[in-house]
C-alpha cells in the first residue's frame, strides 16, 4: 500500500469514531472504529527496515483522524471558554502520542505477534485514567462513555465502571482486526479457511457474550423493596448568558417557586433545583442570611415533608493568613483571603435556628472553574468564562460530602461536571448515599450534542452505583434515571419544565463502588512499567549492535 491508501484508511478510522459519537446513537460502531488504525500500524510494522524497530510515521497517520473525531464531538466546549478552541488539537496530539507509545511497546515486546495489540488497550486505559486525575481533566471522550445511550448493553459496568467499556471496545477492535488481516495481509491469507473461521468465531464471541450477559441482567434486575420518596425536579430555563445573571435573585426564586408549585404536594420529599440557581453570593459562615434561602424556606415550609436542594454561588472566608490555590484577597487587607465557590445547599426547614447543609463542587471544569497549572498558565485567566462572578479557580471540598436528614435517606448531590467521574460519584455511595441528585447548568453549550451527551452519562452513573437519579438542569435535559440506567420524564431543551416521580432508595454497594477504578489503576501501572522496559530494551539493543560492528 502507498502513503495515500494508508492515509485514507486512517481517515476512515476518524470518520467511524465521529459517527459513533454522533449524539451517541451509533455507539456500536466503536467496536470496529479503531480497526483502520490497527491496519495502518500493522502495515508500517511489517515494512520497517531491519535496523529501524519503530516509526514516527504512525503518529502522523493518527493525528488528523483523531483531530476530526475530537473536533466533531467536542467543538461545543468553545461556547463556554475561548481557550477550548485548542482542546481538539491538544486532545488529538495526546491520543496520537498514546497510539505511538503503544506501537513502541508492541515492537519491543511482541513484533508481529497477534497479542501485541493489547498494548493499545493498555495505554488508552492509562490515558483515560490520567484524564480523570490531572489538572486538565477531560474524561468526556473516555471510550466507555460511548455506550451511555445503550444501558441495556453495559449492565456489567456495575463491576467494571466505564474502564470496562473501554477495555471491551479495544478487545472487539483487536478481534475484528485479526479477522480483517485474514483478507488483507498475504501472510495471513495463506493460513486458510479454518484460521479465518476461528477468528470469525472469536470476534463474534467477544462482541456478543458481554452483550448477552448484559441483556440477561437488564431483564432480571430487581430494585430493593424500600420505602419510596417523592422527588420534584425543577428546570427554570434561565439563559446563562443573560437571564440568570440579569434577573434579580428574587426573580429567579419566583420562577423556581412558580414551577415547583405545579407538582409539589403534601407527599413531596425533595424539590431539586439546578446548579447556580441562587445568585446571592452569600458568605458561607452566614448562609442563613441569604434572602434567597430565607425566601425558599418560606415556600418549603408550606409542604410538611419537603426539602429543597439547590445550586448556589457562595463565598468562603479563610482563616487569617491562610492562602489556598483558590484564594482571593480583600482589597483593604492583603492578609485576609476568601474563596468563591460553586455549592449545593440543602435548605433547613427550621425557621428559628436553621442549619442548612452545603457541599462544594470538587471536580472542577478546567479553564472555567479552575486554572490548570496555575503557576504557568495563570496569565490565561482573562480568557476563562465569567460564571456570573465566579471566574477563576473555585474553592472545593477535599472529599465527597453526603446530605443526611433524620427521617430521609442519605443523598448525594453531584454538581455538573462531577457527574462525568464514576469513581467520584461512587465515593458518595460508599459513604451511604441511597439516592443521587445531579444538578447542572448545560445552557453554556447551547443546543449542541454537549448537553445531550452529558445527560446520557447519568445512565452510566446509575448502573455503576445501582442508585436512582434525579437530574435537574437549568436548561438542557432534566430527567429521572432508574438503577438500570433507564431514563424517563425527559424534558425538552430551552423550555421551562417541572417533573415528578417516586424513587426507591437503594442500599446495596456494587463491586465497582467498593473497588473503584481498579482497571484504570492497574492499566496505568503496567503501561508505565512496559514503557520504561521498552526504553531499556531499546538501549540494550543499540548497545549490542555497536558491540558486533566491525572495527
Regions found by a protein language model. Name each.
Residues 18-21, 100, 233, 344-346, ...:
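Conserved hydrophobic/aromatic beta-strand scaffold that supports enzyme active sites
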Residues 215-367, 402-407, 413, 417, ...:
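Soluble catalytic regions of membrane-associated enzymes that act on cell-envelope
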Residues 1-218, 446-447, 473, 488, ...:
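Membrane-embedded alpha-helical bundles of multi-pass enzymes
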Residues 77-80, 130-162, 329-422:
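Active-site catalytic loop in hydrolytic enzyme cores
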Residues 21-38, 69-71, 235-236, 268-284, ...:
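Short, conserved active-site loops that position catalytic residues or coordinate cofactors/metal ions
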Residues 95, 121-122, 270, 276-278, ...:
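CN hydrolase (nitrilase-like) catalytic-core segments centered on the catalytic cysteine
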Residues 151, 226, 303, 332, ...:
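A generic fold-level signal
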Residues 2-5, 205-266, 429, 441-454, ...:
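Non-cytosolic juxtamembrane linkers/loops
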